[in-house]
Amino acid sequence: MIPIQLTVFFMIIYVLESLTIIVQSSLIVAVLGREWLQVRRLMPVDMILISLGISRFCLQWASMLNNFCSYFNLNYVLCNLTITWEFFNILTFWLNSLLTVFYCIKVSSFTHHIFLWLRWRILRLFPWILLGSLMITCVTIIPSAIGNYIQIQLLTMEHLPRNSTVTDKLEKFHQYQFQAHTVALVIPFILFLASTILLMASLTKQIQHHSTGHCNPSMKAHFTALRSLAVLFIVFTSYFLTILITIIGTLFDKRCWLWVWEAFVYAFILMHSTSLMLSSPTLKRILKGKC
């Protein structure tokens, strides 16, 4: 049990982190959305960032409501909010992975014919790939939706005589829900890892190829990109691991350590959100023009 003062402190930290992420997401959507209306077209990276901004905006509000309902034991409301949080969480993972895939195919210097064909196809069909990630999320959330319905049934049966066989089956399916959610996050994370490793290998190769004993502008750009990619890799991997531990949820007394853990988790998410804002040339150009 931690002191109430410490609980309130971490609760405030979590709320401030959440509000900052919401403001960042709103800014991304507003700035890039306005650019979209003005020029009638956006680069694929900006399409992903707008989608990520919308997804993370909804995810953060769902997270705040979900955590407060969990803390105050509003179980029936919590079941309905959990499915919303899971949907936008999975969608956010897929969009982050697609962003890394885009950078990989755009920046990498691989010349294999299969890679060149993939680059042409992916860039050509990018809006459909975004739609596909939404459809995949809808499909992968089905076990969680069924699991939430089962959770509501279990809550309803708490004060009634139980059929142990039925209850055991319901609880086993509820455990399967968490396994399905974990798999739904692992697949885009593996895609992220593969794209990141390929991109880092390509950038390292380009740096070695252009190395002439002094730092020319091309090498500086490659070093900057490699450093940014390493930071993104560390932050996103930490984000994945903390979310995975949150889903498993067996390491902590949720009510006691909820706000400490959430403040820790969303510190990584805030860093990741900030790094995404800095990854868009369009966004940086517009914001610099406003200053």
Curated annotation (Swiss-Prot):
Q: Where do the TM regions start and end?
A: 2-22, 42-62, 85-105, 126-146, 183-203, 229-249, 258-278
Tell me how this protein sits in the membrane: Multi-pass membrane protein
Q: Which UniProt keywords apply?
A: Cell membrane, G-protein coupled receptor, Glycoprotein, Membrane, Receptor, Sensory transduction, Taste, Transducer, Transmembrane, Transmembrane helix
What residue ranges lie in the Cytoplasmic compartment? 23-41, 106-125, 204-228, 279-291
User: Which cystines does this chain contain?
Assistant: none
Which Gene Ontology biological process is one annotated for this entry? Answer: detection of chemical stimulus involved in sensory perception of bitter taste
Residues glycosylated per entry = N80, N163
Q: Where in the cell is it found?
A: Cell membrane
According to its record, what are the GO cellular component terms? membrane; plasma membrane
Which SUPFAM superfamilies does this UniProt record tie to the protein?
Family A G protein-coupled receptor-like (SSF81321)
**InterPro entries linked to this entry:** TAS2R
Q: Which domain of life is it from?
A: Eukaryota
Q: What does this protein do?
A: Receptor that may play a role in the perception of bitterness and is gustducin-linked. May play a role in sensing the chemical composition of the gastrointestinal content. The activity of this receptor may stimulate alpha gustducin, mediate PLC-beta-2 activation and lead to the gating of TRPM5.
Any extra detail in the entry? Most taste cells may be activated by a limited number of bitter compounds; individual taste cells can discriminate among bitter stimuli.
Complex formation: Interacts with RTP3 and RTP4.
Family under the similarity heading: Belongs to the G-protein coupled receptor T2R family.
Q: What is this protein called?
A: Taste receptor type 2 member 16
Q: Which organism is it from?
A: Pan troglodytes (Chimpanzee)
Show the taxonomic lineage: Eukaryota, Metazoa, Chordata, Craniata, Vertebrata
